[in-house]
Amino acid sequence: MAEQQAQAQPQLALERIYVKDMSLEVAGAEVFTKEWQPELDINLATTAEPLDEDHYQVILTVTVNAQNAGAAAFIAEVHQAGIFLIKDIPEDQVGQILGAYCPNILFPYAREVISDIVTRGSFPQLLLAPVNFDQAYAQSQQQVTDGEGNA
C-alpha cells in the first residue's frame, strides 16, 4: 500500500550511444598540394523522437565544410545518436532535456568522431570547440516566443 502511495521518482538515463551515420567527402587530390589554411563552416542540428512512452532517440548532427584557398577541401559529417530514458519528469522540462542536456552528452562523442575521420582523411587534426547547448536552446526558445508575439 505504501508503495502505491509513493510518488514515482523521476528517471533520466543514457541507455545507449552510437554513431548512426558518418562520412568524409574529400573534394579532390589537389587539395593536398596547397598550403593548409582552411576556412571552416560548422553546423549543428539536433532532432529528438520518442521510441516509446519512456525512451527517446536524440540525434546530434555535426557538419563541417572546409575550404582551402577558396576551393572545397572536405565535408565531414556525423550523426551521433543516443537513446535516453526519460520517465516521470514534468512535461515542461522534457524539451530542455532533449534540446540541451542530451546534446551536451552527445557532443564529446561527435567531436571525437569528426576529429578521427578528418585525421584519417590525411588532414591536420580538427578539434571542435565546446558548445553551450543550454544557451543555444534558450535562444531558440526565445526566437519561438518572439515569433509567436509577432504573429
Swiss-Prot record:
Keywords: Chaperone, Cytoplasm, Protein transport, Translocation, Transport. One of its GO terms (molecular function) is unfolded protein binding. It comes from the Bacteria. Gene3D superfamilies: SecB-like. Signal peptide: none annotated. GO terms for cellular component: cytoplasm. GO terms for biological process: protein folding; protein tetramerization; protein transport. InterPro entries: SecB, SecB-like_sf. It is found in: Cytoplasm. One of the proteins required for the normal export of preproteins out of the cell cytoplasm. It is a molecular chaperone that binds to a subset of precursor proteins, maintaining them in a translocation-competent state. It also specifically binds to its receptor SecA. Belongs to the SecB family. HAMAP family: SecB. PANTHER family: PROTEIN-EXPORT PROTEIN SECB, PTHR36918. Homotetramer, a dimer of dimers. One homotetramer interacts with 1 SecA dimer. This is Protein-export protein SecB. It comes from Psychrobacter sp. (strain PRwf-1). The lineage of its organism: Bacteria, Pseudomonadati, Pseudomonadota, Gammaproteobacteria, Moraxellales.
